[in-house]
Amino acid sequence: MLNEFPIFDYEDIQLIPNKCVIKSRAEADTSVTLGNHTFKLPVVPANMQTILDENVAEQLAKGGYFYIMHRFDEVGRIPFIKRMHDQGLIASISVGVKDYEYDFVSQLKADAPEYITIDIAHGHADSVISMIQHIKKELPDTFVIAGNVGTPEAVRELENAGADATKVGIGPGKVCITKVKTGFGTGGWQLAALRWCAKVARKPIIADGGIRTHGDIAKSIRFGASMIMIGSLFAGHIESPGKTIEVDGEQFKEYYGSASQYQKGAYKNVEGKRILLPAKGHLQDTLTEMEQDLQSAISYAGGRQVADLKHVDYVIVKNSIWNGDASH
């Protein structure tokens, strides 16, 4: 039963340091392996239209970072796979669960992507299980990520259907309003939900949503994530596809949720919103800073690599690091 577990979120947790065993933080190894490939960091930008486009995906792949291309340019997906493979880069795309997606998956046999993410808001669904089975039948060598889910039962079912990884998080993101519109989700207790799901997972979990600081990456790993999907921290860069808007002489970039009216083009079943973020510098600068902060975290853990973060102790401090200020 969930009620037997403590309920907490990122701002409620502080990790407890161990004796440092490396001479320099630069010695800490931040790389992770997912499927048959190793990546520089255990993070992946959210597969959203205001976070990445084909150019950003290419930049990430060339830099040795994991990426998942969004599914909102359906006709562009096969040319995108070719573009990446022609350069010797991995292809990682998203699909939905509508009927026509089955034919699309079958068309990929000639040039199969290395990764496919089944990307729907409520991933604990018969439709997702059917799509996992279809992809595994048609493209047995493709690594399948399925989500999003928020319970151990969902993780077990998707893994049993053939998913190679599950994506955990229902509505904790900055531009997601699922919890407000429906009353459901992991918003406000995403880290506890991750821990709950990780206890039954036999395959990797991708924690998705609710990351507000770089320290939250280390906390996600401590509670069972192999990879962390991040939206708002990756939005608003010079390379980001979101529109640049000037307000009172300041530059902002738009960032909206995948189920917002701005993405859907119509106000129907809306569970996302649009916000403006102050324009940031280059994406690579953020990736470098994340790497350095994660190296510091590994050194505080008394470790040498990412997996060492899984074994540290922690305390539940109930918002005290932000003095209850959820905006931070």
Swiss-Prot record:
<feature type="active site" description="Thioimidate intermediate">
    <location>
        <position position="176"/>
    </location>
</feature>
<comment type="similarity">
    <text>Belongs to the IMPDH/GMPR family. GuaC type 2 subfamily.</text>
</comment>
<dbReference type="InterPro" id="IPR005994">
    <property type="entry name" value="GuaC_type_2"/>
</dbReference>
<dbReference type="InterPro" id="IPR013785">
    <property type="entry name" value="Aldolase_TIM"/>
</dbReference>
<dbReference type="InterPro" id="IPR001093">
    <property type="entry name" value="IMP_DH_GMPRt"/>
</dbReference>
<dbReference type="GO" id="GO:0006163">
    <property type="term" value="P:purine nucleotide metabolic process"/>
</dbReference>
<feature type="binding site">
    <location>
        <begin position="205"/>
        <end position="228"/>
    </location>
    <ligand>
        <name>NADP(+)</name>
    </ligand>
</feature>
<dbReference type="GO" id="GO:0005829">
    <property type="term" value="C:cytosol"/>
</dbReference>
<dbReference type="Pfam" id="PF00478">
    <property type="entry name" value="IMPDH"/>
</dbReference>
<dbReference type="InterPro" id="IPR015875">
    <property type="entry name" value="IMP_DH/GMP_Rdtase_CS"/>
</dbReference>
<keyword id="KW-0560">Oxidoreductase</keyword>
<dbReference type="InterPro" id="IPR050139">
    <property type="entry name" value="GMP_reductase"/>
</dbReference>
<protein>
    <recommendedName>
        <fullName>GMP reductase</fullName>
        <ecNumber>1.7.1.7</ecNumber>
    </recommendedName>
</protein>
<dbReference type="GO" id="GO:1902560">
    <property type="term" value="C:GMP reductase complex"/>
</dbReference>
<comment type="function">
    <text>Catalyzes the irreversible NADPH-dependent deamination of GMP to IMP. It functions in the conversion of nucleobase, nucleoside and nucleotide derivatives of G to A nucleotides, and in maintaining the intracellular balance of A and G nucleotides.</text>
</comment>
<dbReference type="GO" id="GO:0003920">
    <property type="term" value="F:GMP reductase activity"/>
</dbReference>
<keyword id="KW-0521">NADP</keyword>
